[in-house]
Amino acid sequence: MNAEPSIQSKLLDLAAVDAELTRIEHRRKVLPEEQEVQRLEAERTARKDASVKVEILIDDLDRDIRKLEGEIDAVRKREDRDRGMLTSGSVGAKQLSELQHELTSLERRRKVLEDDEIDVMERREAAAADHAHAGANLDQAEADLVDAERRRDDAVADLNVAQQRCDSDRSALSGGFPADLLAVYEKQRATGGIGAALLQARRCGACRIELDRGEISRIAKTAPDVVVRCPECNAILVRTKHSGL
């Protein structure tokens, strides 16, 4: 295949644009701002779970408090009933003794229930404080995530601008090559990653391998308009006065 040396040299410009496109694509895949968003999303989920866990605990404690209040109220009503019977003077000695014994038992039971209620209410108060703390943590995580998403979107927008510029440059450059030369370049780029590279100081700019004397001698004898390729990676080699020929 033949192409004017000036045309071959422009392949380096195309390769430079393609290298930048490759870097842009790689940066998209490993974008630090995206990784930070993902980390903060996980953090927000964890803090949301922690907040929900405390909410469930508070609901359970509220249910326990209502149950204890109901039991305490029932005991007090029985106490009031028994005291009413005691003060009525209408009960006999045996029933009087039974009522007094029952009142003692009811009072003991009420105190146990009231102590339990105090314990649950204290736990409920602590849980409410935990919930407020968890809510503050969640609010902070959501604010951090919003900020990280903004930075990520800005970074992606910058990459989009850079890619659009490279796409435009590539389109302009591609139109200046013979179809057969461009086809060889594109095929090599698709398989080897780098379509064309500078031969400099006897070293291929694509695979970075130094060519042996025999290969260098062969290339040196090849007409300037003949397209030569690296024997190692098959990239198109662009020759200049710095090629070491």
Summary of predicted features, one role per range:
Residues M1-P5, A19-D59, M85, A132-A148:
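Short, charge-rich amphipathic alpha-helices with coiled-coil/heptad character
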Residues L145-A206:
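Coiled-coil termination/hinge junctions
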Residues K53-I65, L106-A127, L173-S174:
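Amphipathic alpha-helical coiled-coil segments
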